[in-house]
């Protein structure tokens, strides 16, 4: 019998395999992700992290295996079903994907377009309650005072926070974040990871995030999953893990101080 996501399980992936031509990107990866869990995928470039993330919302169709997200069988979904699913699955990209010439408020409002019948042009064309909601999300990420600023005038860390606010505007059940801090300095990377952690806890939102930074993963993740050559080689709660435990995924050990965990 095929697994069906229950009340506490948001993602169920079973034996997921993905090939791009002759290249095996994922090799029989199985994974459960629970509600209000921040799960970090770790591994070298090319290990399959981003591919797995995109298989979870159907951006990459699986070659074999099954993916269930909130009761929707992604691997069997029609185009209409995938569009409906993506309205419930937020995606935060490494390079922000904001519309630079639009204000921060307008960029956040774009996250709510899936709830409207027709496209909108300009913040004032959105319903008043949605404008208030978008402002609340900007306030949540500490950028309410920047609502009228063009997005392309903000720093990288600020732009990523706007992107998270836009994703929250979708009211997602699942948030996927692909290397969300890769282009940020350490201070802003910590701010963004802390924001994702707080959203996960306070909104009971499930977050699956790919990272390269082991120390950030140890500091903020509830659970760590390591990929190596497309195979899952690590799946453990982050509590009690050391940097050396995690670096086995990378087949090397680098000395560093592990930060105190967030509670």
Curated annotation (Swiss-Prot):
EC primary class: translocase
Primary localisation category: membrane
Organism of provenance: Mycolicibacterium smegmatis (strain ATCC 700084 / mc(2)155)
Membrane topology: Peripheral membrane protein
InterPro entries xrefs: AAA+_ATPase, ABC_transporter-like_ATP-bd, ABC_transporter-like_CS, ABC_transpr_PhnC, MetN_ABC_transporter-like, P-loop_NTPase
Positions annotated to bind ATP: 43-50
Domain of life: Bacteria
Lineage: Bacteria, Bacillati, Actinomycetota, Actinomycetes, Mycobacteriales
Gene: phnC
Protein name, UniProt field: Phosphate-import ATP-binding protein PhnC
């Amino acid at each position: 019998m095929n697994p069906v996501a229950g009340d506490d399980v948001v993602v169920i992936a079973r034996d997921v395999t993905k090939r791009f031509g002759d290249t095996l990107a994922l090799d029989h990866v199985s994974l459960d992700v629970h509600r209000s869990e921040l799960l970090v995928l770790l591994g070298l470039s090319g290990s399959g992290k981003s591919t797995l993330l995109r298989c979870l919302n159907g951006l990459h169709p699986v070659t074999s295996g099954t993916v269930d997200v909130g009761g929707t069988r992604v691997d069997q979904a029609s185009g209409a079903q995938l569009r409906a699913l993506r309205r419930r699955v937020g995606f935060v990209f490494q390079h922000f994907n904001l519309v630079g010439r639009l204000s921060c408020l307008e960029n956040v409002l774009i996250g709510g377009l899936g709830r409207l019948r027709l496209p909108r042009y300009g913040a004032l064309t959105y319903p008043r309650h949605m404008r208030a909601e978008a402002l609340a999300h900007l306030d949540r990420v500490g950028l309410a005072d920047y609502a009228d600023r063009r997005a392309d005038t903000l720093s990288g860390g600020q732009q990523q926070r706007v992107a998270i606010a836009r994703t929250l505007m979708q009211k997602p059940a699942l948030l996927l974040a692909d290397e969300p801090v890769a282009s940020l300095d350490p201070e802003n990377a910590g701010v963004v990871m802390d924001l994702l952690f707080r959203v996960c806890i306070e909104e009971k939102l499930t977050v699956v995030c790919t990272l390269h930074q082991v120390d950030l993963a140890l500091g903020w993740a509830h659970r760590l999953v390591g990929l190596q050559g497309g195979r899952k080689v690590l799946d453990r709660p982050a509590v009690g893990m050391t940097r050396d435990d995690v670096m086995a995924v990378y087949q090397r050990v680098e000395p560093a101080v592990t930060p105190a965990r967030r509670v």
